[in-house]
C-alpha cells in the first residue's frame, strides 16, 4: 500500500493550520497514495476545551469532500472533538467515498512534570477513550494509536 505521511509545525492559529493542511494534502496527492496520514493535533494544539470542535465541523467536512473527490483515504491523526459532554483527542478515518469509517479516542493521556517543574496534563482537557479500534482499507487492516498509547 502506498502511504503519504504529512508532518507540519502546528501553531496557535486554527485557520492557519487548516490552510497549511489543505496545501500539504494537495501536495501529497502527487505521490499517488491510497492513504494519507496526518499527525496528532494537526489542526490545533491546546489545553483549553473551548477550542474543541464537533464531528460536523467544516474542517472535517472539507477532508471528507477531499477524500471523495480525489478517491483517497485519509487518517485525521487527531482532533479535539467534543460530544457536548466531554472533549476527546480523537482520530478519524475517512474512506475514499468521504465517509467516516472509524474513530478512536486516545486512551492514555500524556501527563508529565517537566524538569522545570512545569506540569502538562492532557487529562485536564481530554477524556480518555476506552476501546481499541481497527479499520480496513483496500484489504489492509490497521490499528489506531495516538502518541502515548504505544
Predicted regions and their residues:
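Extreme N-terminal starter segment of soluble prokaryotic enzymes
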Residues: 1-5
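Conserved N-terminal beta1-alpha1 strand-loop-helix module at the mouth
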Residues: 20-24
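Conserved residues at the C-terminal ends of beta-strands
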Residues: 9, 39, 110
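Cys-nucleophile CN-hydrolase/nitrilase-fold catalytic domain and related Cys-dependent amidase chemistry
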Residues: 14, 25-97, 103
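A short, mixed-charge helix-start or loop-turn motif at secondary-structure junctions
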Residues: 6-7, 45
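Substrate/cofactor-recognition hotspot
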Residues: 17
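Short polar catalytic/cofactor-binding loops
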Residues: 7-13
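Active-site catalytic loop in hydrolytic enzyme cores
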Residues: 82-150
Amino acid at each position: 500500500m502506498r502511504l503519504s505521511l504529512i508532518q507540519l509545525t502546528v501553531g496557535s492559529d486554527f485557520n492557519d493550520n487548516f490552510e497549511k493542511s489543505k496545501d500539504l494534502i494537495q501536495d501529497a496527492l502527487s505521490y499517488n497514495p491510497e492513504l494519507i496520514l496526518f499527525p496528532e493535533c494537526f489542526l490545533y494544539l491546546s489545553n483549553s476545551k473551548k477550542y474543541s470542535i464537533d464531528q460536523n465541523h467544516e474542517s472535517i467536512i472539507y477532508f471528507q469532500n477531499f477524500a471523495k473527490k480525489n478517491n483517497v483515504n485519509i487518517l485525521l491523526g487527531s482532533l479535539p472533538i467534543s460530544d457536548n459532554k466531554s472533549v476527546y483527542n480523537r482520530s478519524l478515518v475517512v474512506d475514499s467515498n468521504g465517509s467516516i469509517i472509524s474513530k478512536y479516542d486516545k486512551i492514555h493521556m500524556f501527563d508529565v512534570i517537566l524538569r522545570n517543574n512545569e506540569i502538562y496534563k492532557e487529562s485536564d482537557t481530554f477524556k480518555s477513550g476506552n476501546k481499541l479500534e481497527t479499520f480496513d482499507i483496500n484489504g489492509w487492516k490497521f490499528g489506531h494509536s495516538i502518541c502515548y498509547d504505544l
